[in-house]
Amino acid sequence: PDRFCPFPGGRGEPDCASITAAIEACTRTKCVKSLGKPDPIMLQVTMEGLDARVEHSMMVGDRLQTDIQMALDTGMVSGLVLTGEATADDVRALTDEHRPRYVMDRVDRLIPAAVWHELGWTDDNRTDS
């Protein structure tokens, strides 16, 4: 599970793994099963609930060890957005079997160019939070 959730400016907020670690420390009990990322159960249950097929879907995320690994473990196409902790150098260092199929600087790159044009969007429309 993710230890922290990155925010603009380099700060982070506690995420599932750090909260689990705090509970383990307080209770002196080890968590025996995590159903969060990268465990494929999350995507499998979601896909069943949506009556969707893995081969017609794509998991997009900003973390290699959780988002992309979950997609790979589920057999789903993966897309990495370089807005989180992963960098292009991190992707280049991966073996082919661990590399996401798509890598993009922004999630709106998934929108076809024709739609961008129809909406009058340009790269200048980017807003950084």
Regions found by a protein language model. Give the residues of each.
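Asp-based, Mg2+/Mn2+-dependent phosphohydrolase catalytic module
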Residues: P1-S129
